[in-house]
From Swiss-Prot:
Role, per record: Involved in gene silencing mediated by a class of 21 nucleotide PIWI-interacting RNAs (piRNAs) that possess a uracil residue at the 5'-end (also called 21U-RNAs) and that guide the Piwi protein prg-1 to its DNA targets for silencing. Not required for the biogenesis of 21U-RNAs. May also be involved in gene silencing mediated by 22G-siRNAs (a class of 22 nucleotide endogenous small interfering RNAs (siRNAs) that possess a triphosphorylated guanine residue at the 5'-end) and 26G-siRNAs (a class of 26 nucleotide siRNAs that possess a guanine residue at the 5'-end).
Tree of life domain: Eukaryota
Subcellular location: Cytoplasm, Perinuclear region; Cytoplasmic granule
Quaternary structure and interacting proteins, as annotated: May interact with pid-4, pid-5, app-1 and prmt-5.
Protein's recorded name: Protein pid-2
Tissue spec. comment: Expressed throughout the mitotic and meiotic regions of the germline and in oocytes.
GO cellular component: perinuclear region of cytoplasm
Presence of keyword Metal-binding: no
GN (gene name): pid-2
Protein's organism: Caenorhabditis elegans
Length: 454
């Protein structure tokens, strides 16, 4: 339907007559395209005869005394269906409801990571090799996971194509010889986070990023007896003895406090021997051949934690001590009671007791934890560092502030970028000196166009 609102001002004369009320003309708009018929569209057009030429305006407002009967919408189908502007807000509210139900903003990780890394039915595995089965119909994949060790599973060509582009996958046993397998896109080869190399029936070499746990090299007299754990998402924990730390220290010519600072990221190359005689379920002994700590150029360097922080490292802020043993402390979560049990080893005793005996037994603790498995089943979380929140923040030099999820919702991302632009970057902007604006000035003297004598 076409709605034409016309008004007549009378003949052109010196005497101005009062305007007549506009007339509404309704007529059908013919369909222009014969290939595909669309429902008729109702349009609003206003015709004014102030001049000799009639001008059609689609944005003119209809007077209030014509706001009767059904309303007419621009470019709205005649069947009455409407598109609401707040659909995006509804979807966003639903997403936040899911996040609030599964986790909270304080957890500093997104809901997808909660589902992926807290559902312990999944195996997070490194894809080492694949080869066709004797019947040439399926593929046999050689996988290694911290939870299940070496596994040889048979997948269909469709499943093989879905995980063929990433070296890190997750799979779940759904039946006798049946598996559900999914890729982990954050470990794509172009990201550089995981670079595997397989020597057929000889060994595996892997370049990967890891994170170091806490050992007090100054105040702890027993630090030589503690093992340093380097956590990696692909192959789990790699333990270093005091002799291994000393060898790395001699190669890098740095102190152990600089190399193995608490929660310091590192880039390592690990190797392991492998042959076909190793049965399924056997663990692999990894050895570190190259160790490079990522020492921040400035305090709280935001790029390290945002891009390279292992996704399976979780943070809890509501832990309380339940039991003390000669080997360490056991803690549990107040909010997720019965689901989160954390073990802090002997290297964490000093930091947990740093705030006094009363706080050590009744106070809330902060901990960065990684999963620990026994007999291919999840047993508990092991703490990289645990203690009073303020002490943990001081010891880690604020590195936990770098731990932010890989993706925020668009609204939060927009607010963060706007704050960064207005309050952080704006105060750091300084006008460049003249020698930086025009580099040839450094070759000129103030008295004329002459080069420097040297």
């Amino acid at each position: 339907m076409t709605v034409i609102i016309a008004s007549h001002w009378g003949p052109q004369s010196k005497q101005m007559l009062p305007p007549e009320p506009p007339r509404i003309i309704l007529r059908e708009v013919p369909v222009q395209n014969n290939q595909k018929e669309h429902p008729p569209v109702q349009e609003i057009k206003t015709v004014s005869s102030k001049s000799k030429e009639h001008r059609v305006s689609s944005s003119r407002k209809i007077p209030d005394h014509f706001d009767v009967g059904p309303r007419f919408y621009m470019n709205v189908p005649a069947d009455g269906s409407e598109v609401f502007e707040d659909d995006e807000k509804d979807v966003e509210n639903e997403c936040w409801a899911v996040i609030e139900r599964i986790g909270s903003e304080d957890d500093k990780f997104e809901a997808s990571e909660l589902v992926e890394y807290r559902d312990h039915d999944w195996y997070i595995a490194l894809a080492i090799n694949k080869e066709k089965t004797p019947d040439k119909a399926n593929y046999q994949h050689l996988l290694y996971s911290y939870r299940g060790g070496i596994q040889r599973i048979i997948l269909t060509p469709q499943q093989t194509d879905s995980i063929d582009k990433t070296p890190l996958v997750k799979y779940k046993i759904i039946g006798d010889g049946l598996y559900e397998v999914l890729p982990i896109h954050s470990s794509l080869p172009q990201t550089g986070l995981i670079s595997p190399k397989y020597r057929y029936n000889k060994g595996v070499e892997l370049r990967i990023f890891g994170i170091v746990n806490w050992i007090d090299f100054v105040l702890d007299d027993d630090h030589q007896t503690h093992r340093t754990m380097v956590w990696t998402d692909a192959v789990g924990p790699i333990y270093l003895s005091a002799a291994d730390r000393a060898n790395i220290r001699r190669k890098l010519l740095l102190t152990e406090m600089q190399i193995f600072a608490p929660l310091r990221m590192c880039h390592i190359t690990v190797k392991a021997e492998f042959n076909f005689s190793i049965p399924d379920g056997s663990p692999i002994q990894w050895t570190i051949s190259s160790f490079q700590p990522l020492i921040e150029e400035s305090e709280k360097d935001p790029n390290i934690g945002r891009n390279l922080w292992p996704a399976r490292v979780l943070r809890f802020d509501d832990l309380v001590v339940t039991k003390k043993t000669p080997n360490g402390y056991w803690l549990k979560s107040q909010r997720l009671e019965g689901h989160v049990n954390v073990f802090a080893g002997a290297n964490q005793i000093g930091i947990i007791e740093s705030a006094g005996e009363k706080y050590a037994t009744k106070g809330s603790m902060m901990a960065f934890v990684v999963p620990c498995y026994q007999n291919s089943t999840f047993a508990y979380f092991e703490a990289l560092i645990a203690g009073p929140p303020r002490v943990v923040m001081i010891i880690t030099e604020g590195r936990f502030l770098n731990y932010c999820p890989k993706t925020w919702p668009p609204s939060v991302r927009k607010m963060r970028d706007q704050y960064q632009k207005e309050h952080v970057l704006k105060s750091e902007v300084r006008s460049s000196p003249i020698c930086m604006k025009q580099p040839d000035y450094c070759l000129k003297s103030l008295r004329g166009f002459s080069e420097c004598p040297f």
